[in-house]
Amino acid sequence: MPYAPDLLLVNANVLTMDPARPRASAVAVAGGRIVGVGDNAAEVAGGARARDVLDLKGATLIPGFHDAHNHMIGFGLSLTEIDLRVDSLDELYARVAARAAATPAGEWIIGAGYDQTKTGAHPHRDALDRVAPGHRVWLKHASSHMCVVNSLVLRDLGIDVTAPQVDGGRVAADASGRPTGLMEERAQELVGDLTRPYPLARLTDAVATAGETYLREGLTSVTEAGVGGGWIGQSPVELAAYVAAREQGRLHVRAELMVISDAFHALTAHPSDGIEIGIDLGLRTGFGDDWLRLGPMKIFTDGSLLGRTAAMSAPYDGDPGNGDSNNKGYLQADAGHLTQTIIAAHQAGWRVAAHAIGDGAIDLALDAFDAAASKHPRRDPRHRIEHFAAARQDQVARAAALGVIPVGQGRFATEIGDGMLAAVGPDRHPWLYRQRSLLDAGVVLPGSSDRPVVTGTPLLGIHDMVNRRTASGAPFNAGEAITAEEALRAYTWGSAYASKAEHVKGSVEAGKLADFTILSEDPTAVSPDRIAGLEVIATIVDGEVRYDARG
């Protein structure tokens, strides 16, 4: 070792995620990198005296948690919105009324997190008018794939009397044709046109406040699942909020940013370059550094299971969700357009993250990736399918053969699992959020939450990946449960692999980034029902203690 370590961690139970050395008790850090791992602290430190020594007294040290699908700015913004995770419409309306009473007339009332499978129905514009007179009201669904607004908003949009047709979305209406206030998928862009873009200062604050929560939960890296446009982006210059947060010392965790496909446009590059679409200057996946980097292009192919808008090959079970007993959901754009966009982004050198929840949409994504590889061969493009929620067994095998990474959310089981089980019906329960099938097929499994759709604490995610129970206690496709070791690997090395960053993070090995999460106990050694209750003692990023629960 050429110089003394900055930090030496000793008396630790180190779970390295390195098959060559699964466990250790000491780790040395210098210059933000791991420089030694082993069981002899003196040897790990290279015989030198470390500047700081941290005695972990038997606590468990793991690679820092990495959430592979997380809406960081969306979560930061949600912290100032009404929490609508309630079990009845009466409670929802009461919370809206309380916020309205405390808000100056004319200001927006914004809430998030309601689930009609728990409240019994979607909120209605007329009820919102009564509880929040004089305010524009915008309530976001738990899935983020739909929202409800009141009459003032509908009037601003010029659609308070009749519902327009929206490509890739729907403005719901009652039997008389009058809009109810419910807006699905791309119809939400109409509301966004009234409220966005948000000021960069507000978005920068959202990055910072979200990061503070993440540190408390042991997160050291996130993949932001869509910036720059469409119904999910907050501003066309959203990346600048992350840059500003970093310049101000308020980017607390490492961030990889997916760029939404709406931000892509035709580029007049030289024909030999093969770059037909992209973002300006030819920036693409991989641009940046270990703190802030451009990730894949994010493209939405369909919607959500909770909202019954995901594109399925057969109709939804029970309540169709939109009055159509043959409802199979829908794609968010023409299939040919979606396919060509994926192929063009692949050709231009981007990794692609295709949101595909229903098995019909998954077929489209797999077909597009197959066509892209055939037309424009690339070595290990490592494309992704976000969610891969209702996947047939043949689709598991095909994803494995294509080298596509399905990025699921085990965390969904507890918070919204009951609603998804009801949506697909018993015959398709075995399709839901596969884990065991993917691992058995040789696919690398990442860990992610889709926060703020659900509470994104990684330990809760690991708990759900192992236990697979809904809020009501029902099994959530229990045959797809995995072990604590496998779930922990997913939230560390697996997520790094999904970001094509396993060479710099995801395991405790010499040369890798010094990002660690320190836990009160070993998640692989406690009973499965105790995983959620473990404590994050400290979070270390870049070799520095960024969070210490014990001062």
Protein language model regions, located:
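Divalent metal-binding segments
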Residues: 2-11, 15, 19-280, 295, ...
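Carbohydrate-interacting/catalytic domains
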Residues: 7, 548-549
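C-terminal accessory region downstream of the catalytic core in glycan-modifying enzymes
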Residues: 14-16, 533, 537-548
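A generic structural signal for residues embedded in beta-strands
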Residues: 36-37, 111, 516-519, 548
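Short alpha-helical functional segments enriched in proximate histidine and acidic residues
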Residues: 99, 213, 497-498, 539, ...
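His/Asp/Glu-enriched, well-ordered alpha-helical/loop segment
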Residues: 205, 340-353, 357-383, 387-388, ...
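Acidic (Asp/Glu)-rich catalytic clusters
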Residues: 246-248, 282-292, 378, 399-401
